[in-house]
Structure formats: structure tokens, C-alpha cells
A protein has these predicted regions:
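Glycine-rich phosphate-binding loop plus the immediately following alpha-helix
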Residues: 124, 128-155, 176-234
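Glycine-rich, mobile lid/loop segments that gate access to catalytic sites or pores
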Residues: 113, 119, 126, 130, ...
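Conserved small/polar residues in nucleotide/adenosyl-binding loops
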Residues: 243-245
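Short beta-strand-loop/turn "lid" adjacent to the catalytic site in phosphate-handling enzymes
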Residues: 51-127
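Glycine-rich beta-alpha junction loops
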Residues: 59-62, 114, 165-168, 185-190, ...
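Conserved active-site and cofactor/substrate-binding residues in soluble primary-metabolism enzymes
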Residues: 11, 91, 95, 133-137, ...
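Nucleic-acid-processing active sites and adjacent nucleic-acid-binding tracks
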Residues: 25-46
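Gly/Thr-rich phosphate-binding beta-strand-loop-beta motif of the actin/hexokinase/Hsp70
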Residues: 1-27, 58, 157-182
Length: 246
């Protein structure tokens, strides 16, 4: 039997899912700011779920499968691509990753789309965000569910996975059970909070492109909402022309 936990560090929430031989034993969700404010408390929560065989840690843009205890500072820089103290984006992920690495928990960092050998090299040129590590995990789940639901082998599964998150919209292409391409949230279409791919001239006019810029300018901003009252459900009943445009 295998006892595992997956950590999904989203813009709005950090979610935990634990499976014991396929049966759910942990399903928790925390506001992101709250979860990352105290890495030690978060680690303690995971330790209470022991014994564990594996934890899929918060991996950002991903790394080749790497035990957290062996991850270097350069690995963490590449996985999270944010300067120390950067206020924009998901602040606190790197300190959490360090805390997990210092623990005795069996944490591994997992790959993003760009790390996959199944993705042709020419598609990776001048790309970074082809899909974060959590998107790869979502695609793996979709492939498995599609195979089981249609009673066909994995190599017969082809699909397009679209994920509409709290900030970003991303898409992954699967053919023959393998991820072949992806468009990550910062390179894709408009998201709920994120503007998605930026026109090069927009980036030029911005002057600088801090991490916070990647997390703004989305559908909620077009609708004129601030972060406190932003909710996708509000689009069901638009009350102004601007909301109708979105």
C-alpha cells in the first residue's frame, strides 16, 4: 500500500490531497497567505499525517524529479522565478520549500511541462511557462480518469486539458497518453486575475515587469473589481457593460 500527499500551491488557496492505497484520507484547503505565513506550522500539519511514502511538494514551474532535501538554492530560484522578498505572485513559496527540505518528510519536487522528454525540443525554444508542475499533475489525473472511464489503455488517450484557476488560464495537449505541448498561465489567454500573455509592446510601455504584473490585468481587473470582491460567480449576472465585454 502507498500513502501519499499532494500539495497544490494556488494563487488563492493551498490545497492538500492525501491518498492511502487510493482512498482519500486528507482533503484540506487553506487561504494561500495563511498557509504560507508560517512554514513550520504547515510542515507540522504534514508530519501529523505520517507515516508517508511520498509528498509531491509545491514545485512552481517545476524541476526534474528532485528530492527536496537535495534541492539547491539555484534549483529553488529556477522553480519559483521570484526574487527574495518579491511582493507579487505567490509570496512565501521559497521559504516553504526550504522548510520542507529541512524536514524529514519524503518530499519531492516534480517537473513542469518544459521538463518533459515527451515535449519536442523545438517547442521549448524561448519558453519558460508551458505549464507549471501542478498542471502536469492535473493532466496525469485526466489521462488516468479518461483511460478508466472509457476502458481504454493509456496510450489510446488523447485530450486537451484546460485549467481555469484563481488567477491563470492554462492548457495542455495530450496525444497517445503523453503530454506534447502546453500554454502556461503567463503565456496563455486572459485569466480571472492574470492578463495572460503580454504583447511585447505592452511590456515595453510598462517599463519594468515585476512579478506582480503577471498576476494582474485579468478579467476581474477589466470588470473593475478589487481583489477583495473578485469572484468568478459575479460574471453570471453582469451589471455593467464592462463586465459584459469580459
Amino acid at each position: 500500500m502507498t500513502r501519499v500527499i499532494g500539495i497544490d500551491p494556488g494563487t488563492v488557496s493551498v490545497d492538500l490531497c492525501g491518498l492511502d492505497d487510493g482512498a482519500l484520507f486528507l482533503d484540506r484547503s487553506f487561504p494561500t497567505a495563511e498557509a504560507l505565513a508560517d512554514p513550520a506550522a504547515f510542515v507540522a500539519l504534514l508530519e501529523r499525517a505520517a507515516p508517508l511514502d511520498l509528498i509531491a511538494g509545491p514545485s512552481g514551474y517545476g524541476l526534474p524529479v528532485t528530492p527536496a532535501a537535495r534541492a539547491t538554492e539555484e534549483d529553488l530560484r529556477l522553480a519559483f522565478l521570484a526574487a527574495e522578498g518579491e511582493a507579487g505572485g505567490i509570496g512565501g513559496l521559497r521559504p516553504l520549500a526550504r522548510a520542507l527540505a529541512r524536514s524529514a518528510l519524503p518530499v519531492v519536487f516534480t517537473p513542469g511541462v518544459i521538463h518533459l522528454a515527451s515535449v519536442p525540443e523545438h517547442r521549448k525554444v524561448n519558453r519558460v511557462d508551458m505549464g507549471t508542475a501542478d498542471k502536469v499533475c492535473a493532466a496525469a489525473l485526466a489521462i488516468d480518469e479518461q483511460a478508466r472511464g472509457t476502458n481504454r489503455p493509456v496510450h489510446k488517450v488523447s485530450l486537451v486539458l484546460l485549467e481555469l484557476g484563481g488567477a491563470f488560464t492554462a492548457g495542455l495537449a495530450v496525444e497517445g497518453g503523453r503530454i506534447l505541448d502546453g500554454i502556461g498561465g503567463t503565456a496563455g489567454p486572459l485569466g480571472f486575475r492574470s492578463a495572460g500573455a503580454l504583447d511585447g509592446e505592452v511590456a515595453f510601455l510598462a517599463g519594468t515587469v515585476p512579478k506582480s504584473l503577471l498576476f494582474g490585468g485579468g478579467a476581474a481587473a477589466v470588470a473593475g473589481w478589487d481583489d477583495a470582491d473578485a469572484s468568478p460567480e459575479r460574471f453570471e449576472h453582469p451589471t455593467a457593460d464592462r463586465k459584459s465585454v469580459v
